[in-house]
A protein has these predicted regions:
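Active-site-adjacent mobile loop/cap segments within catalytic or ligand-binding domains
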Residues: 86, 100, 137-196
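Catalytic-core regions of hydrolytic enzymes
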Residues: 1-11, 16-123
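A generic structural signal for alpha->beta connector loops
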Residues: 50, 106, 136-137, 153
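Active-site phosphate/pyrophosphate- and oxyanion-stabilizing loops and adjacent acidic/basic residues
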Residues: 81, 127, 146
Length: 196
């Protein structure tokens, strides 16, 4: 892309927060906390490489009007608004997955099905995540229902770092060293996406 110093900006979105814990792990880990920890580590990595990083949330909170009727919708709208106002090179939303079969595991990247750029980025990111687990056979996946993917005006991907329903992965995702490894892979993935 044509990245200049002026617009070397990435938005990192840590899914959930506050009254909305997201998925709850088999080890009782809350998705909202894991998301923020990983995003903070990505932020550090990107800043080291000269990128400016805007976080949709820096602490454990929901966004938007806390008095609003449907807090979740206000929260999602507020996230989209931050992304569209900032107009970064890309937005990356950090989430964790969950499934009723606890054997299911592995990171997976989602993109908006009508975005060529989103698809390219998601595939590149999925490849970057192989450094965390080279046995992960998951492919980047199109989606046309996620509000965040539909409403953002810049290339946006969602990275589901792993399954909190898988005991082994849930343990890893709450481990600082593993979070750092995951964050490093995502940082490299972001840079590969936007600088090529």
């Amino acid at each position: 892309g044509n990245v200049t110093a002026k617009n070397k900006i990435i938005v990192l979105d840590s899914g959930h927060g506050g009254d909305d814990p997201g998925k709850i792990g088999v080890n009782q880990a809350k998705e909202k906390d894991v998301n923020l920890e990983i995003a903070r580590k990505i932020k550090k990595g990107l800043e080291k490489k000269g990128w400016e990083v805007v976080m949709t949330r820096e602490k454990d909170e929901m966004l938007g009007d806390p008095q609003a009727g449907n807090k979740k919708i206000h929260d999602m709208k507020a996230r989209v608004e931050i992304i569209n106002k900032t107009m970064p090179q890309a937005a990356v939303s950090i989430h964790q997955n969950s499934y009723q079969d606890e054997q299911i595991r592995g990171a997976q990247v989602f993109y908006y099905s009508h975005s060529e750029e989103g698809k390219r980025m998601a595939e590149q990111m999925q490849k970057a995540l192989l450094t965390v687990d080279e046995t992960n056979t998951r492919q980047a996946k199109a989606n046309d229902t996620y509000y965040l993917l539909k409403r953002t005006e810049v290339p946006t991907i969602i990275v589901e770092c792993g399954f909190l329903s898988n005991p082994e992965e849930a343990a890893k995702l709450t481990d600082t060293k593993y979070q750092k490894k995951m964050a490093d892979a995502i940082t490299k993935g972001i840079i590969a996406c936007v600088e090529n």
